[in-house]
Regions:
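Glycine-rich phosphate-binding loop and adjoining beta1-alpha1-beta2 segment
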Residues: 46, 51-89
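Conserved SAM/SAH-binding loop
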Residues: 98-106
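N-terminal charged helix/coil linker that caps or initiates catalytic domains
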Residues: 1-26
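Hydrophobic/small residue at the entry helix of a nucleotide-binding pocket
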Residues: 33-34
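Conserved S-adenosyl-L-methionine
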Residues: 42-48, 136
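Conserved N-terminal Rossmann-fold NAD(P)-binding element of oxidoreductases
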Residues: 27-29, 52
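Glycine-rich phosphate/adenylate-binding loop
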Residues: 2, 21, 109-114, 126-129, ...
Length: 241
């Protein structure tokens, strides 16, 4: 696979590629954001990826999720993502968890073996538990804030959670993490105000029992995912130096 990453080596150097090949990154949530995180990490040569998601690919995912096609509908998202990654880099090691991350299942995940964690889940309890466990294990984590109901992909920023503005999810995260003694967290967020959708209050087809289906377009969650992956890559390379 040396030729596959030769252009990357020109930019990052051989030692950086070796570091990435030896790295293990866990991506929690393989959806519109997390799928693009995995895609970029795989194409940059990260050697071991943990894929965590309980969902299967739905028709309503096709508008924004890189793993979603008419051929993958019904497959576990982790299976579809694994197949795609191995088509990109057959040497990659994949660990799959076909489950939903919850505070009570946190013990099933080897946080002390991860070099980096990406939070791309969409429930507050899971996000808080992820950050808390990474903090306890001294593992770097980057979190995705709200990407739904937005149209401006140029509005995303990388910041400390304490410095975010205009993001309702970030506001709640900041308050809840402060209660847990955690005051700093790297996040990707947007200051674009959420756009009201016509079907507000209707059930979410991707998450039975949930209300307020968020609107989405292909060019917003994908950009957030690529930014998240870029931060992971840059941080892993810095840690190697």
């Amino acid at each position: 696979m040396e030729q596959a990453f030769s252009r990357t080596e020109l930019l990052l150097g051989s030692s950086a590629l070796e570091r990435l090949a030896a790295s293990r990154v866990a991506v929690f949530g393989i959806g519109g954001v997390g799928g693009y995180v995995c895609e970029a990490l795989a194409r940059t040569g990260v050697g071991h990826l943990d894929l965590i998601d309980s969902d299967t690919v739905a028709v309503s995912n096709i508008n924004r999720q890189i793993i979603a096609t008419t051929k993958t509908v019904g497959q576990y998202k982790t299976d579809a993502m694994e197949a795609r990654i191995l088509d990109i880099n057959p040497a990659a090691k994949i660990t799959k968890h076909n489950c939903f991350f919850l505070p009570e299942t946190a013990a099933d995940f080897p946080f002390n073996q991860y070099d980096y964690v990406v939070d791309a889940v969409d429930t507050m309890s899971a996000k808080l538990a992820l950050v808390t466990h990474c903090h306890a294990a001294d593992v770097p984590i980057i979190c995705a804030m709200g990407a739904g109901n937005k149209l401006d992909p140029t509005g995303f920023q990388v910041a400390d959670l304490a410095k975010t503005k205009m993001d309702p999810l970030a506001r709640v995260m900041r308050r809840e993490l402060k209660k847990r003694g955690i005051h700093h967290l790297k996040v990707v967020y947007s200051e674009e105000p959420p756009i009201p959708t016509a079907d507000a209050g209707q059930a979410d087809p991707d998450h039975p029992g949930h209300r307020n289906t968020p609107g989405s377009v292909a060019f917003v969650p994908s950009v957030m995912g690529l930014i998240l992956a870029g931060e992971v890559i840059k941080d892993l390379i810095k840690a190697e130096k």
